[in-house]
């Protein structure tokens, strides 16, 4: 990373992606041959415009079907198919369900809703990655006095929500401006979650 600083102007927004992969093995990769690569590339942070989402026909896998407890590259095609389907309908992202028909997450990030001042996010049932950003946002909101609940969410819950937003490594906290044909405002809970996270990240980065 230090060697590449001269190639990047100050203030450039970068995405840093650490990756582990097995360099040997055929059907069964040789874990002892695991190698590491750090992928750094320029990509701007999302703006305040938010993103649109629709419900996907593709479902998230159960943990006995795929390594859902890891950020594994083999899981990406599942989300990519959902995003392609959403794009063909004119949406930016997709809301994916689990095998029971409950909300799992967005194709690329965890999902949150706000209704009557209460923030809810799907309970960790093993069908999605309980990511670092999700856990951080959850802790920050609770510490700030917000009523936050981890529970099963249905499509009807999302459709009736006052706000919908996401959390993830790339966008951090980003609000949803439209679910299907219903427009949504950048509401107070999404703004609060975004500010809490960015304030935390800035204060941590200065240490």
Predicted regions and their residues:
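Short, acidic/charged, Gly/Pro-enriched secondary-structure junctions
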Residues: 1-26
């Amino acid at each position: 990373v230090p060697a590449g600083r001269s190639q990047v102007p100050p203030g450039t927004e970068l995405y840093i992606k650490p990756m582990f992969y097995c360099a040997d093995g055929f059907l069964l990769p040789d874990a002892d041959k695991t190698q590491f690569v750090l992928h750094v590339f320029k990509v701007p942070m999302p703006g305040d415009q938010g993103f649109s989402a629709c419900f996907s026909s593709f479902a998230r896998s159960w943990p006995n079907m795929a390594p859902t407890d890891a950020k594994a590259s083999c899981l990406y095609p599942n989300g990519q198919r959902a995003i392609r389907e959403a794009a063909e309908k004119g949406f930016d992202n997709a809301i994916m369900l689990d095998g029971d028909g409950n909300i799992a997450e967005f194709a690329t990030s965890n999902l949150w809703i706000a209704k009557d001042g209460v923030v809810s996010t799907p309970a960790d049932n093993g069908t999605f990655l309980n990511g670092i950003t999700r856990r951080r946002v959850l802790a920050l909101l609770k510490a700030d006095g917000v009523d936050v609940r981890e529970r099963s969410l249905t499509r009807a819950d999302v459709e009736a929500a006052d706000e919908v937003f996401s959390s993830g490594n790339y966008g951090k906290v980003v609000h949803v401006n439209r679910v299907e044909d219903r427009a949504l405002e950048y509401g107070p809970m999404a703004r609060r979650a975004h500010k809490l996270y960015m304030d935390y990240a800035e204060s941590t980065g200065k240490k």
